[in-house]
Amino acid sequence: MSASVSRFASDDSPSMSWIVFPAAVCVLCAALLAALDLNEAWFIAWNTAASGIAPGFVWAGITNLASTLGAFALITPALAWRPRWLAATLLAAPVATLYTHGLKQFFAEPRPAAVLAQDQFNVVGLPLRTDSFPSGHSLTAFVIAGVVVLCASPAVRRQWAWVVLAAAVLMCFSRVAVGAHWPLDLFAGAAGGWLSAVIGVRWSAHWRFWERRRGVQTMGALMILVAVLLAFEDLGYPEGLWMQYLLVVWGMAGAVFALVRPVTCKVPA
């Protein structure tokens, strides 16, 4: 295995602080928000501020990055160099799905469009009214961020972790910007996403199919299918179609490149 791959593939286990701290911060923020009854006030303030920061099509594009298929397309080019990233994301997906859909069904919380008057906030895309808690997009953003940060070597983690986390926070914030979620939903989704990433990374250290040529080829073929499905999926944000199509091209190109140029490590024939 080459040095560049082994540096990320080796079990450079992150410290317990990296495993626990991001999720703990999100849980604490969610608890304070609920205890102080600031959910609605913060939503209106954040949503109003977002409309002054960037136009709707920008927020729609950012929010599409954190859709399920969009996020897989986003991370697909890593397959050629960092196959563990995609493997850990795939392994985290079942846990993340159970978390978000289980809580959505249990709580069945209304979204802002079902509670607030239409003139109180800005909506980008189709208005959503049901199954608000937790935010699936926020969960997805933090699954990707968690995988990238936790799979990285300590040196890379120290240098880039905060950049990756800032990008994930921006994707989460876009859910309030488009009027789809309460702030409480974002924190709950982010916490679940990070913990799902922890599990996915741990499982990827046990099931190392990503080190084999056949494993890389299988993931590449799966990501081609993801890109095709993304091309036809209605994400609910017509203003963000530009990002959706960019993700299709990005994911398809990344998958094809990984299949044409297998990851540079010693694998069985």
Protein language model annotation of sequence segments:
Residues 122-265:
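Membrane-embedded catalytic cores of phosphoryl/pyrophosphoryl-handling enzymes
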Residues 1-70, 101-130, 262-269:
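N-terminal transmembrane-helix/juxtamembrane module of multi-pass inner/ER membrane proteins
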Residues 63-82, 137-142, 146-147:
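Hydrophobic alpha-helical transmembrane segments
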Residues 18-32, 92-96, 165-168, 221-226:
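Alpha-helical transmembrane segments
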Residues 25-26, 69, 89, 93-97, ...:
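Alpha-helical transmembrane spans of integral membrane proteins, capturing the lipid-embedded, hydrophobic core
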Residues 18-19, 75-99, 161-164:
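Interfacial segments of alpha-helical transmembrane regions
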Residues 96-100, 104, 171, 196-197:
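Alpha-helical transmembrane segments of multipass membrane proteins
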Residues 57-60, 87-88, 155-162:
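Membrane-interface alpha-helices at helix entry/exit sites of multi-pass transporters
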